[in-house]
């Protein structure tokens, strides 16, 4: 099985505005060359620009569980979809939501036919998130985020535990992923792919970093 | 003096995506015809699309007090500026921020040369917001939002009190504004303009509503 | 089976300070007379006063998922336990928590041997909350809170759906409960009891209201 | 002038429950012996126990800007006052509030005759907080909290700047305070006293730490 690579652009200088477009282009090329699906997750303000120029799945970093109405400053599913987004992260560790909001965000995204990835921090919250019926859950142990130590190596039990707790909902794993062998390990532990950020976006050559990531396939 | 009209698109169906573009076009025409400055405030995901197509000042509905870095799902000043935004609301009643965040958001926006409008709910918070040195404060008594009763009529003392409390920082007023006479009253009470939303966005003919709004000038 | 009555004091004048003590006394008498377990849930600042004077299970309205440390203004499990609390609500509709916080709060409470009741708003979040393994989940459809219309009558399917989704975790239901027949209906729908507030605390005679509540047993 | 010492108990094991009572007793003795006013700020659940047993001003760590009503899990001014609290921190760095909430909390506290201390993180937010007319502002530069480096030494300009920005509202300073000379420096920079926590609560002998703190007077 080919893994899914979800590349979170966060708010790094290297992945904002023009740089975001460039990074998305690199991701598209690597995806085309390798046959691996790479999803790019730019800042919300950059979604339209990227989806307009590049044929690659673009996801949002956040969505709110709202409907049309008076919700200044919030992120509306229908607006994301119209701008070209095809999915969204929900409850990322840097943008946690209340339990009822996670559910409402997941439902709002589905209403607009957006694929949903609910992020979680441990096995218990993975079980809870999976019970809300998203398309994916993505487990990222907070102590490993940005550590450079891949979760698949540091704590394989949390990954296999998450896969079991998800009861059939597809699982991604994140935190510390930067090499092809990390992706391979993630797949071998039962996940469908990885969620990563700085390992690629802040690499000296992001395209090369992506190529290395998919090289094992 | 000509008033400033700040038109908040919120997340209404009538002001999302294609509809947002259409509404911005109407605003541009009314602004050109009347000589009144109209600022449009679409959802963040719609900023690029509008600023790319229409010559009109576009502001964001929200900004976070962050710098480049790991801030998934947050709104970065530099990303807004690159996408064409020229200013931003801060602390809107539907997206309130912590005190330290209001300050940080105001500083982040200035760093990217974005004009700042801090929203407030009463005279005391207007005084506090103005002391942070934004370009504007916008007072909106929460009990009047969406009421159809203009703050300039229902509670003129809160407007004059806000102007006094702002100590030279320019003041906008909002809540219940929908007619030219409301704008006129706001100016006579010492403000520089108005912040409004549903009175225009949900009007049967938004362009006509904008024309009526600027007709008294 | 005898139902469990959980009486949330909220922050009403009728259930603050001396009034809280009086209400807890009434609850104790009704519990003794009827053999029904009544749990009182006063404000956190009133827990010590009540637990010191009255032999009745006292729960907290909120707990934070923290450990000993620098957490000014937060609610620590061990401090609640030392003050006499024997359990706690988590994620009440008026004090919603992030998903990871619900999990952490539930774990913190267990660490201090406090019984946990996670509050939820619909079937999906009940399933998610139950998967975190609390002692109870309490479903309260937000549209019925304070309505005077009992959830057991207005929407029995949401109650039976919650009982099924909870997969063996005990379920309470709330919103609109004020009479003995509401409690009876709740039990017949498969719950272990009810969570209620204003139906008793704001009754002309709270003791009589409690007596009516347990009269059907 | 004699300084004001505000001792935040946070949620440390050393200052919870029975330990909180013991620490408050030590504070009382040092206050009596030295003539310096020491205010103790225990966890909310410990306020009643301490105020019942010891004659010392007890403040809350947090208060919500609410009135009597349905506010489960929130902190009500009148309940604090009935339990013996005589003042409260507002917007502590570990429990930040939205701007409108800071104002509402300050007003709620005044309504119940509680002395208010609004905490701030820099000169700008000190100016904003002071404009809300609390009894005190307490500036704590976040980078120095728990550092052991007293703000009065590391950054005296931020203290004098805060005193100036407060325009007559009394100022406390915090972060890194642990010795008598830090208190002395704080007073010389124009403040009325200090807000401190771990320097005393986690000292091997808290009473001795407090004696050292007031020794310079």
Language-model region placement:
Chain A
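Catalytic cores of alpha/beta
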Residues: 120-133, 173, 177-194
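Active-site-adjacent beta->alpha loops and helix N-cap segments on the catalytic face
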Residues: 16-23, 42-52, 68-78, 93-108, ...
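Conserved N-terminal beta1-alpha1 strand-loop-helix module at the mouth
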Residues: 1-75, 116, 124-134, 201-202
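Residue-level detector of anion-binding/catalytic polar loops
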Residues: 57, 86, 115, 135, ...
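Conserved, mostly hydrophobic/aromatic
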Residues: 10, 43, 80, 140, ...
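Glycine-rich phosphate-binding active-site loops on the catalytic face of alpha/beta enzymes
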Residues: 86-97, 136-149, 189-209
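Short, conserved beta-strand edge motifs with alternating hydrophobic and charged residues
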Residues: 41, 117-120, 138-140, 174
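Structural motif
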Residues: 33, 83, 112, 132, ...
């Amino acid at each position: 099985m080919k893994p899914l690579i979800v590349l979170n652009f966060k708010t790094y200088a290297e992945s904002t505005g023009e740089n975001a477009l460039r990074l998305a282009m690199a991701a598209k090329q690597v995806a085309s060359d390798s046959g691996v699906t790479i999803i790019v997750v730019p800042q919300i303000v950059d979604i339209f620009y990227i989806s307009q120029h590049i044929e690659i799945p673009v996801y949002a970093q956040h969505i709110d569980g709202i409907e049309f109405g008076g919700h200044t400053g919030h992120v509306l599913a229908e607006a994301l979809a119209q701008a070209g987004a095809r999915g969204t992260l929900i409850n990322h560790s840097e943008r946690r939501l209340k339990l009822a909001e996670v559910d409402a965000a997941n439902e709002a995204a589905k209403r607009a036919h957006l694929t949903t990835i609910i992020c979680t921090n441990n096995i218990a919250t993975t079980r809870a998130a999976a019970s809300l019926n998203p398309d994916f859950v993505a487990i990222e142990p907070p102590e490993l985020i940005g550590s450079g130590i891949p979760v698949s190596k540091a704590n394989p039990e949390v990954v296999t535990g998450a896969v079991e707790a998800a009861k059939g909902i597809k699982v991604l794993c994140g935190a510390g992923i930067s090499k092809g062998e990390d992706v391979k390990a993630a797949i071998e532990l039962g996940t469908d792919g990885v969620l990563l950020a700085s390992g690629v976006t802040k690499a000296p050559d992001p395209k090369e970093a992506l190529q290395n990531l998919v090289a094992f396939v």
